[in-house]
Amino acid sequence: TAAGRGVESSDVFVECALKLLTDEGVLAFVLPEALLDVHNHKTIREIIAESANVSRVSFLGDAFYGVQCPSLVLQLEKSSDPGHSKGAVIERDGREFVVGTDRPLGSENFMLRLTDDEYRLLCRIENTDNCEFLRGQADFALGIVTGDNAKYVSTECGEGMEAVITGADVYRYRCGKTEKYMYPELTLYQQAAPLELYRAPEKLIYRFINRQLVFAYDDRQRLTLNSCNVVIPHIPGLDMRYIMAILNSRVAQYIYEKRYNAVKVLRSHIENIPVPVADEETQRRIISKAEELMAEELITESSVNSEMQTYKTGKDHLQRYRLYEEIDDIVRKLYSVTDEEYEFIKQSLSGDKYML
C-alpha cells in the first residue's frame, strides 16, 4: 500500500482508483513527474506495475502558477497482464510518439521520457562488454555541512584556515581557484566525512547539484563543502584519472541524463555507470590528455619572429575543447559507439557541452 508515514497523497489516490477499476478500465490523473523515478514514489510504481499498463503520458512541465513541480497526465489501463508500456502514446516538448519497444515497468523508474531510439541506445551502452562498476569498488564522502556558512566559511584566509572547494569551483578535470576558506577542525561542523577521505592522496570531486556529470581530480588533500562530494575509486588495473575521463564523457552524461533525469548526482547514479576496462596504452593516451586539462594553465606554442616561443595562458578555451574532444572520441569507442550513434548522443544532450 502507498499509505504510511511521509506518504504522497497523489500516490494514495492512484492506488485507490486502481482498486476500483475492473480489467480494461482506464484512469487518468494529473500527477507530479517525480512519480516516474523519485524514490519516495517507489511503492506506487510497484503497485502500478503489478496491476496496470501505461497507455498515455502527457508531460506538462511547470503547469501550475507559482509552483515549481513538473507535472504530467498519466493514463493507466487495468490489466490481467500488467507492467507494460508498449503502445503508450507519449506527448512531450511539442512532439508525440508511440512506444514501440516495450519497457517493463519497474519499481526503480518508469522509462517513459525516451523515444525508442534513445531507449535502445541507452540499453546497448549499459550492456557494453568488459566493464567494471564503482559499486563496491569506491569510497564515497559527502562534502562538509557546516550548519552555518556565514559563521564558518570566509572569503579571507585567516590564521589556521585553509582553502575549501565548493561546487562552483569544480569543472571537468580540474578545480578552479577557490575563494572560500575554513578551519580544518571537522568537529566544529554539523556533518563531515572522516578526515582521511578528504586527505586521500588522490580523489575525485564532483558537483552534487547539477544536471551534468562534472568530475575534477584532486591530489592536494583539499576539503570540500556539501555542494560537491568525493569519490575515491579502487578498481584494480584502472587509473583514477582514466575513470575521471569516463565519468566526464558524453557517453556517461547520456546514461545519467536519459536514465535518471536528475538534478542531483547521487552515489547510486555514479555506481551504475559502466566503466570499460581499457588496456594500459589506451589509459596512458587518455591520461596524458587529461593531465593537460587538469592544469590550471595550459602550455601552448606560438610563432614569434619565426621562432617557437612557449607561453602560459589560462584562457585558451579552444585548446581545452580540442583536448576534451580527443579524449571523448577515444572513450566513446571503448563503448563501441558508432559515428552515427555518437552524433545522436551529441544532438540529444542538453546543457553546457564542455564545463571545462
Identify the meaning behind each predicted range.
Residues T1-K151, L223-C228, P236-M240, V263-I270:
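Signature of N6-adenine DNA methyltransferases within the class I
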Residues A3-V7, Y183, T313:
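Short, flexible loop segments at the rims of nucleotide/cofactor-binding pockets, characterized by
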Residues D11, L18-L21, E118-R285:
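Polybasic, glycine- and aromatic-enriched phosphate-binding surface used to engage nucleic acids
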Residues L21, G25, L35-V38, S51-R56, ...:
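A generic secondary-structure signal for well-formed alpha-helical elements
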Residues V30, L60, E77, R207-I209, ...:
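Generic beta-strand/beta-sheet core signal
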Residues I48-E50, T166, N248, K346:
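Alpha-helix boundary recognition
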Residues D102-N149, M161, G167-V170, V277-L356:
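Non-catalytic DNA-recognition/assembly elements of restriction-modification systems
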